[in-house]
């Protein structure tokens, strides 16, 4: 460009006008991006050369994971594993509500003076076993995977 001008000045000239309510409402009206894409381009379907919403040009969904369908076009259901034999729900075996008791939980927190050191010092000691107890204080089976 030369002589002190920048490329941005040539592309987008600056308008020095006073900011009024009219210019603010105009700016807010024309800069809202909340309008749905279907209202902005009604003929953007696949017949008009557009794309389905959520689909890319190569037919993949927009998240990049190919959709798996059965030969009949029905989506494959996810395989679910039966984990009842591994760890039965103790609530279904007992009649009362359960509480968890953690043995050996010790928490020490020392707060330093803000002028000396603005940090907290936290020490947490937790034992490995967490035992579940029902209302009558009976210990139920531990479920350890």
From Swiss-Prot:
Ranges of Polar residues composition bias in the record: 83-108
UniProt entry keywords in alphabetical sequence: Cytoplasm, Lipoprotein, Membrane, Myristate, Palmitate, Synapse, Synaptosome
Main localisation: cytoplasm
Region (Interaction with CAMK2A) residue spans: 3-35
Top-level taxonomic group: Eukaryota
Annotated Basic and acidic residues bias: 109-119
Region ranges (Disordered): 27-119
Lipid-substituted positions (S-palmitoyl cysteine): 3
Covalently lipidated residues, kind N-myristoyl glycine: 2
InterPro entries listed in its UniProt record: BAALC
Bias kind Low complexity: ranges: 32-46
A GO cellular component annotation in the UniProt record: nucleoplasm
The UniProt record lists the keyword Membrane: yes
Intracellular or extracellular location(s): Cytoplasm; Synapse, Synaptosome; Membrane raft; Postsynaptic density
Post-translational modification: Palmitoylation and myristoylation target the protein to the lipid rafts.
Tissue specificity as recorded in UniProt: Predominantly expressed in neuroectoderm-derived tissues. Expressed in the brain and spinal cord, and at low levels, in the adrenal gland. In the bone marrow, confined to the CD34+ progenitor cells. Not found in peripheral blood mononuclear cells, nor lymph nodes. Tends to be expressed at high levels in acute myeloid leukemia and glioblastoma cells.
Assembly notes: Interacts with CAMK2A.
Task performed by this protein: May play a synaptic role at the postsynaptic lipid rafts possibly through interaction with CAMK2A.
Protein name in UniProt: Brain and acute leukemia cytoplasmic protein
Originating species: Homo sapiens (Human)
């Amino acid at each position: 460009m030369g002589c002190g001008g920048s490329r941005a000045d040539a592309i987008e000239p600056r308008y020095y006008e006073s900011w009024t309510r009219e210019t603010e409402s105009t700016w807010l009206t024309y800069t809202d991006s909340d309008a749905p894409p279907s209202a902005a381009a009604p003929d953007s379907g696949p017949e008009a050369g557009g794309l389905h919403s959520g689909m890319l040009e190569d037919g993949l969904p927009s998240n990049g994971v190919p959709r798996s369908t059965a030969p009949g076009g029905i989506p494959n259901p996810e395989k679910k594993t039966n984990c009842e034999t591994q760890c039965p729900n103790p609530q279904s075996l007992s009649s009362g509500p359960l509480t968890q008791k953690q043995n050996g939980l010790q928490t020490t927190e020392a707060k330093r003076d803000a002028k000396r050191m603005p940090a907290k010092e936290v020490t947490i000691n937790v034992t490995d076993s967490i035992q579940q107890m029902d209302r009558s204080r009976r210990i139920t089976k531990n479920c350890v995977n």
